[in-house]
């Protein structure tokens, strides 16, 4: 049953297509007169006159129907035996004339003469003459008075069949018989082409050859005329079958109008399309309209042409008439077959880019590639500012607005907007469930067999014209080998400076480096006089100093919250940042607190040095001021308090760690180092009365944590000697020693 249903659909489709083709053929027949002036109407009725006026003021009238008696008479005349009855019959038969038709004056379009056939009465007596002597001419002359100066004179020369005489019909209907002397020369080259033609024995006076001529924009153009010479073998008019002329009433096929040096083309008024034929232009104009007259009787879809409808019907019936000669595949359209052979068999890429070496199988891909040179993005998104070079990417982008996800994972049923995203999902999430195809030439593993075929064709196929490495002179005939070779140049510093030891991997880096030697700064600011070696520096300068809307980027330290304008500065700070709690920085760096303390010490150092230079010395003869001796010692850092003991014993304290003493105390850099503070005491000897100077070294107790009971004494000690002077108790104790 299914087979019968398919056959019924096929028969119905063929009947439908044939009906469409007949209607289309009839419409083309009716409108084909405008396409070519030399084409004659295909359907005529017996005895009917078809006159077609297409911007023409001259029409040629010829005999449509030949009487059978006339054909028989013509044969007898050629053989030399003509019966009197036949002569009488010919007297009352037909005559071929050329009549002037007065038309309305309008510009004459070149090459738009039409031949039509009408029956006319014939009253011409025939004498016993040969065929050669009956060669005549029809002259259709239009007086110059009736035409404008720009309109051409048209002359048409034809050979006469036997049994006819040439007459001239005037504008008012008067008939004038042409004499033999007025006939055109017999040596026209167009007559000599006929194999049955024999040159006349008697030479006649030579006159100018009569041709159909017209003028186009001041240039004379020759036009070939119709040739109606007789053929003895078939007894027909030249180049026309007599049975078709008499039975079907179809006129002979005209020759094409040939213009010397002029090629007529038709151009679309709506775009830049050009074509050599009017029918092609008419078919193209349908692409600018929404007219789709051809509808499918199965699904209702409409198409512009019958060819598109036929291809569509093949999709219903499953017919694939176009078979590939190189494999077993078949296609619905011829375009699909051509594209298949180029991709699979011939690898031909006829569409080449004029700006680079790119070549493509399809012209649409070439147009898309050319937009990469011009930067044109004609396909604009109506919802945002996105623009694309082709419609495919625009459709893919529109899914981000619509939320459509047409691609579904067959394992977990997750949906995606792009097929590539779905493939990556399958490879990453469902690797154990995916069939793996290993490339036999490399280590590549591919999930789909079709993708493996693409990989083999692109990476491992043999290239007849080898490709050269862009880094060296090596040539490879395989793309994969070329890529692997170029990877060996990736980390190679091939560009070396000829003025220093600098080397780099990229040429652009070397160009920028050489500007440090030459001092060249080609990038100048348009708002000030600054120049730069790199364009990035110019852009940064312009944004920072000349752009009022510029907001500098803030790089915040994650430890202390401090902001920086440059990332590398922030990274350098973060390596040694102590954080908000004052914890020592990483990699053994100084803490934030210690850095600030050091800055304060350096400031106080400068102040002390300036004060010491400006201060005047004020020293007594007997003693020296030792004020700095007490204050120079830095305050000891707090240490954990030990457990108190009931009876503390003086114990020599351990030396403080080196880490606790950093830097030099302020105001002591230019002074000589003093080991211990000293004091001069004058003592008078009671026996002799001499005065002796005793130098006393003040030994300061090392810093130690006092006990709880000794805190008050330690705090009161500085009050006794605020300036560091020796008290009397100290002097007496030293004298006792």
Curated annotation (Swiss-Prot):
ZnF endpoints (C2H2-type): 266-288, 294-316, 322-345, 351-373, 379-401, 407-430, 437-460, 467-489, 495-517, 523-546, 555-577
Sequence similarity: Belongs to the CTCF zinc-finger protein family.
Residue numbers spanned by region Disordered: 180-211, 573-687, 699-727
Quaternary structure and partners: Interacts with CHD8. Interacts with LLPH. Interacts with CENPE. Interacts with BRD2; promoting BRD2 recruitment to chromatin.
Gene3D superfamilies the record matches: Classic Zinc Finger
Taxonomy, superkingdom: Eukaryota
Skewed-composition ranges (Acidic residues): 610-636, 704-714
Compartments (UniProt record): Nucleus, Nucleoplasm; Chromosome; Chromosome, Centromere
Keywords, ordered alphabetically: Acetylation, Activator, Centromere, Chromatin regulator, Chromosome, Chromosome partition, DNA-binding, Isopeptide bond, Metal-binding, Nucleus, Phosphoprotein, Repeat, Repressor, Transcription, Transcription regulation, Tumor suppressor, Ubl conjugation, Zinc, Zinc-finger
Name of protein: Transcriptional repressor CTCF
Residues annotated with N-acetylmethionine modification: 1
Polar residues bias spans: 668-687
Stretches with biased composition (Pro residues): 637-657
UniProt-listed SMART domains: ZnF_C2H2
Matching PANTHER family: GASTRULA ZINC FINGER PROTEIN XLCGF49.1-LIKE-RELATED, PR DOMAIN ZINC FINGER PROTEIN
Sites of the Glycyl lysine isopeptide (Lys-Gly) (interchain with G-Cter in SUMO2) crosslink: 18, 219, 699
Changes after translation: Sumoylated on Lys-74 and Lys-699; sumoylation of CTCF contributes to the repressive function of CTCF on the MYC P2 promoter.
Entry's Gene Ontology BP terms: cardiac muscle cell development; cardiac muscle cell differentiation; chromatin looping; chromatin organization; chromosome segregation; DNA methylation-dependent constitutive heterochromatin formation; epigenetic regulation of gene expression; gene expression
Gene that encodes it: Ctcf
Gene Ontology MF: a single term: chromatin loop anchoring activity
Main location group: nucleus
Protein task: Chromatin binding factor that binds to DNA sequence specific sites and regulates the 3D structure of chromatin. Binds together strands of DNA, thus forming chromatin loops, and anchors DNA to cellular structures, such as the nuclear lamina. Defines the boundaries between active and heterochromatic DNA via binding to chromatin insulators, thereby preventing interaction between promoter and nearby enhancers and silencers. Plays a critical role in the epigenetic regulation. Participates in the allele-specific gene expression at the imprinted IGF2/H19 gene locus.
